[in-house]
Swiss-Prot record:
SUPFAM superfamilies the record matches: LysM domain
GO molecular function, one term: lytic endotransglycosylase activity
Keywords for this protein: Repeat, Sporulation
Region (Disordered): 115-160, 585-643
Name of the encoding gene: exsA
PROSITE patterns: LYSM
7 X 13 AA tandem repeats of P-Q-V-K-K-E-N-V-G-N-I-V-S as annotated region, ranges: 238-328
Protein name as annotated: Spore coat assembly protein ExsA
């Protein structure tokens, strides 16, 4: 019989294993213990000496612990990938351990919770309780178990148990698991394979991962080849014959296209911002009318341009020299959109001089023509605000420059013409609201400016004609209210006088002909009156819309019989209107079109053949009668209606 003095961290289970005594035998021998699961340091424990020979046996414990060791080994092998697999073993100890071991487990848990938890962290060297964890985890990690797997079970347990607690400090992750592993001393021998398996798996995973990742990385092509088909120098528009350098927007420019040339037909060297058309040789920049035979460059909307129309050609059947935003087709030779304007023309306030014509405020001078505010100068024509300069024509805000023509917001440039919102470019005509400008005809509200004709309210300025309110002045024709004066024709109210024609109410006098109050005139100034755009109202009036692409667009509110007319040069829509009959048999429209409403070719008393409502966003606006592109035959009703 031996007497063991309990030390910190000792439990009956540890003492039994230390001396190789059966736990039940040790428990029966020490009957003085009121609670075998709770022993205090300094207590004397009787250890029977008869069972000393059990130390030399292969199984340090009784038969039930051997079974437990086997089960624990199986459990550990299953849980090898996780270093916390010992926690999984705890479940096995409660379930698979025989009943004789359950009190020991309870005792160890209580003692471990009370004493060892504090002392394991503070003084782990003196405690035997750390021993199973040392053996369970310290040995497989250090791989010392190759030499001493059996010795720690048999003789090493007595002296070395107290010497090996410092190893626990190295492996402090085991401290989390200290509370439940007084029983886990036996499964030490199966753990040596666990460590190499962990290392082997990790190394293999790293190797395999590197092998798997490396080929993928090697397969991945650097530089993120995003856009195939981009061959050389960011050449956006095809058909560029010879000298496309950098971002060239309009291809097929023959000889000397220098710096943002807006109006073609300049004889030899188009340099700087040239605004006036009828430049003979080199058509560069925004040419609106197609049918140029030879050199169709960049965003040509209508084909059949004979010779050298470059960039943004909108209206077909222009024979030779169409320059800068020409809207009306069937112009024989040299129809210029901004007629009667001498290149060094009216300038805006706060504008640097030497601008060819109509520039907005806060614009750098020497711009070819109509630019929006906050635009870098030297732009070919009609650009949006916050745009990079030197763009061929009409670009959207926040767009990359050097786009051939009408682009959408947040759209890639180089779109041929009229595009939908958030749509890919190269749409021929009829665009919806929130569309880019420079549309052949009939645009919806919230459209970008630089439209050839008929624009809706809330449009950007610098349109060849018919601009909305809050538009910069010096526009060739038809401007909205709050416009600067000296406009060629059709200005809105709150406009300075000296306008050639069509001014709104609250306007200075000297207006040539009628405009509806608060309405966009939408009439083409100085155009050949070759067609009756509105069959019901044919009038020898230069301010009519000639031959537009699409349905005929008649002059807005011009030459309409009305007794209550203002004493202006030409009939204006009645300011005080009564129920009147135009004599055409159609309904009479008492009010002028409101901003945002459908701006169609319907004059005040035109028989409504088109929708009364503006096209909704997302739907294409189609011309009601496409065949009647060039007007309808004059009917007898026109003769009755004309005054």
């Amino acid at each position: 019989m031996k007497i063991h003095i309990v030390q910190k961290g000792d439990t009956l289970w540890k003492i039994a294993k230390k001396y190789g005594v059966d736990f039940d035998t040790l428990k029966k021998t020490n009957t003085q213990l009121s609670n075998p699961d709770l022993i205090m340091p300094g207590m004397k424990i009787k250890v029977p000496s008869k069972s000393v020979h059990m130390k030399q046996q292969a199984g340090a414990g009784s038969a039930p612990p051997k079974q437990y060791v086997k089960e624990v080994q199986q459990k550990e092998f299953a849980a090898t990938p996780t270093p916390l697999g010992i926690e999984d073993e705890e479940e096995v100890t409660y379930q698979s351990a025989p009943i004789t071991q359950q009190p020991a487990m309870q005792q160890t848990q209580k003692e471990v919770q009370i004493k060892p938890q504090k002392e394991m962290q503070v003084k782990p060297q003196k405690e035997v309780q750390v021993k199973p964890q040392k053996e369970m985890q310290v040995k497989p990690q250090k791989e010392v178990q190759k030499e001493q797997p059996i010795q720690k079970e048999k003789p090493v347990e007595k002296p070395s148990v107290i010497q090996k607690p410092p190893v626990i400090e190295k492996q402090k992750p085991a401290e989390k698991e200290n509370t439940k592993f007084s029983v886990n001393v036996l499964p030490q021998p199966p753990q040596p394979p666990i460590k190499p398996k962990k290392e082997y798996k990790i190394s293999d995973v790293i190797k395999k991962g590197s092998e798997l990742i490396a080929p993928q990385i090697s397969k991945m092509k650097p530089n993120n080849i995003i856009s195939p088909q981009t061959k050389k120098n960011n050449i956006i528009s095809p058909q560029v014959k010879k000298e496309n350098v950098g971002n060239i927007v309009s291809p097929q420019v023959k000889k000397e296209n220098v710096g943002n040339i807006v109006s073609p037909q300049v004889k030899k060297e188009n340099v700087g911002n040239i605004v006036s058309p009828q430049v003979k040789k080199e058509n560069v920049g925004n040419i609106v009318s197609p049918q140029v035979k030879k050199e169709n460059v960049g965003n040509i909307v209508s084909p059949q341009v004979k010779k050298e129309n470059v960039g943004n050609i909108v209206s077909p059947q222009v024979k030779k020299e169409n320059v800068g935003n020409i809207v009306s087709p069937n112009v024989s030779k040299e129809n210029v959109v901004i007629p009667q304007v001498i290149p060094p023309n009216i300038q805006m306030p706060n504008i640097m001089p030497i601008m060819d014509n109509n520039q907005p405020p806060n614009i750098m001078p020497i711009m070819d023509n109509n630019q929006p505010p906050n635009i870098m100068p030297i732009m070919d024509n009609n650009q949006m605000p916050n745009m990079m300069p030197i763009m061929d024509n009409n670009q959207m805000p926040n767009m990359m420059p050097i786009m051939d023509n009408n682009q959408m917001p947040n759209m890639m440039p180089i779109m041929d013409n009229n595009q939908m919102p958030n749509m890919m470019p190269i749409m021929d005509n009829n665009q919806m609201p929130n569309m880019m400008p420079i549309m052949d005809n009939n645009q919806m509200p919230n459209m970008m400016p630089i439209m050839d004709n008929n624009q809706m309210p809330n449009m950007m300025p610098i349109m060849d004609n018919n601009q909305m309110p809050n538009i910069m002045p010096i526009m060739d024709n038809n401007q909205m209210p709050n416009m600067m004066p000296i406009m060629d024709n059709n200005q809105m109210p709150n406009i300075m006088p000296i306008m050639d024609n069509n001014q709104m109410p609250n306007m200075m006098p000297i207006m040539d002909n009628n405009q509806p109050p608060n309405m966009m005139p939408y009439q083409m100034p100085y155009q050949q009156p070759m067609m009756p755009p509105n069959p019901y109202y044919q009038q020898p009036n230069p301010y009519q819309m000639p031959y537009q692409q699409g349905a005929p667009f008649g002059p807005q509110h011009t030459s309409m019989p009305n007794q209550n007319m203002m004493p202006m040069d030409n009939n204006m829509p009645p300011l005080v209107q009564g129920e009147e009959d135009c004599g055409c048999g159609g309904e009479s429209r008492l009010y002028s079109p409101q901003p945002g409403g459908p701006q169609y070719a319907n004059p005040l008393y035109y028989q409504p053949t088109q929708s009364a409502y503006a096209p909704q966003p997302g739907t294409m606006y189609y011309q009601p009668d496409p065949p009647n592109v060039f007007g309808e035959p004059v009917s007898e009703e026109e003769d009755e209606e004309e005054v």
